[in-house]
Design a protein with these regions (language model features):
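Active-site acidic/histidine proton-transfer and metal-coordination neighborhood
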Residues: 84-188
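Active-site-proximal loop/turn and secondary-structure-junction residues that shape catalytic pockets
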Residues: 16-18, 50-52, 76-79, 110-114, ...
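Short, well-ordered alpha-helical microsegments
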Residues: 55-57, 174-175, 196
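N-terminal pre-domain/capping segments
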Residues: 1-105, 134-135, 141-145, 183, ...
Length: 196
């Protein structure tokens, strides 16, 4: 075998069935169809999508029936544009949900100044994407470390998801973020589809 399936688990995001940013893409696909097809394809884990039940017990039951579990959940942070008190409160609520469904990873993407959902705004040209200054980098990395520490104290790994149209999009921005955060608390969710 290519890998030991007792130690390596393959998960998938539901974006191939329904798109959270553009719900009309895959709008006809139900939650039940999505997770059933994931399981039939051999995946044992998945991220949470917009059609998933919001009740942890209902979600866990549906996945248990298919031999699956939640691998992670996307969390939109706003470290640069709201207070850390608000950020921590929302982050902890997401950890509570993930804990209830048996997950131990959370994928974080900084959405302050994001243009990812603006289909009429170019991401790579025209200077539309926000570029952080040194002060913003400091605030961002300290905030990310704080969220990572909270996650770690609860047995979670915070995995940062670089994303097109956000303040951490390029390889240089990703390198700077990783170099200025604590490796005990901040991990990388490497996305080849979004790396520029």
């Amino acid at each position: 075998p290519m890998f030991d399936s007792n130690h390596v688990f393959l998960g998938i995001a539901p974006i191939g069935w329904c798109n959270d940013d553009m719900p009309e893409l895959g709008g006809e696909n139900t939650f039940q169809q999505t997770v059933s097809e994931m399981a039939l394809a051999g995946f044992t884990g998945c991220e949470i999508g917009n059609k998933y039940p919001t009740d942890p017990a209902e979600l866990k039951k549906a996945l248990d029936l298919r031999g699956m579990r939640i691998a992670s959940r996307w969390y939109s942070s706003f470290i640069l544009t709201r207070s850390m008190e608000e950020e921590e409160k929302d982050f902890i609520a997401n950890l509570d949900f993930l804990e209830a469904v048996g997950a131990n990873h959370i994928n974080v993407s900084e959405q302050s100044y994001s243009i990812q959902g603006k289909v009429d705004v170019p991401i790579l040209t025209g200077g539309h994407k926000h570029v952080m200054n040194d002060e913003e980098w400091d605030r961002f990395c300290k905030g990310l470390n704080r969220l990572g520490q909270i996650a770690s104290e609860r047995g979670f790994k915070l995995c940062f998801h670089h994303h097109m149209g956000t303040v951490v999009q390029t390889s240089e921005e990703t390198d700077r973020m990783m170099s200025n955060t604590d490796p005990r608390y901040v991990f990388l969710c490497y996305d080849t589809g979004h790396f520029t």
